[in-house]
């Protein structure tokens, strides 16, 4: 969950008491702590709902890598607005207004789903040939 660095740097390290509502940590730190708590349970299924929205892209990348390698046998359902959060998924479901508009892998959706392609371009600034 990429939490060790900032937790270790706290005055009391892993013995630090968090304030009510976690007001003594940032939004991204709260998200990483929530992910860490979920991982401690070693779940068979892990549902992450926009769980890295307050985390910088470099940390998000490290979290994705750790989830892939450390939880290889865990089914992960990731709800995200950032395409980078899901582009390596086995399957991506694109939704708009509560309706499924596309299902597939990243490369397939880039070619076949205009909505997915537009989101990708807006988030990365990279043009794509359909």
Which role fits each region the language model picked out?
Residues 88-94, 114-115:
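Conserved catalytic segment of ABC-fold P-loop ATPases
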Residues 40-44, 73:
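A short, proline-enriched helix->beta-strand linker immediately N-terminal to the Walker B motif
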Residues 69-80, 86:
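Conserved catalytic loops of ABC-family nucleotide-binding domains
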Residues 46-49:
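Catalytic Walker B motif of ABC-type/P-loop ATPase nucleotide-binding domains
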Residues 103-104:
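ABC ATPase "signature
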Residues 60-72:
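Helical segment within the ABC ATPase nucleotide-binding domain
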Residues 1-17, 58, 115-118:
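Conserved "ABC signature" C-loop
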């Amino acid at each position: 969950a990429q939490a060790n660095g900032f937790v270790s740097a706290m005055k009391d390290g892993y013995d630090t008491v968090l304030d009510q509502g976690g007001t003594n940590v940032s939004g991204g730190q709260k998200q990483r702590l929530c992910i860490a708590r979920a991982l401690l349970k070693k779940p068979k299924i892990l549902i992450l709902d926009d769980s890295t929205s307050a985390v910088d892209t470099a940390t998000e990348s490290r979290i994705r890598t750790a989830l892939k390698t450390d939880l290889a046998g865990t089914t992960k359902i990731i709800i995200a607005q950032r395409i980078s959060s899901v582009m390596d998924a086995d399957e991506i479901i694109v939704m708009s207004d509560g309706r499924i508009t596309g299902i597939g892998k990243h490369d397939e959706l880039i070619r076949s789903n205009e909505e997915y392609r537009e989101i990708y371009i807006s988030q990365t600034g990279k043009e794509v040939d359909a």
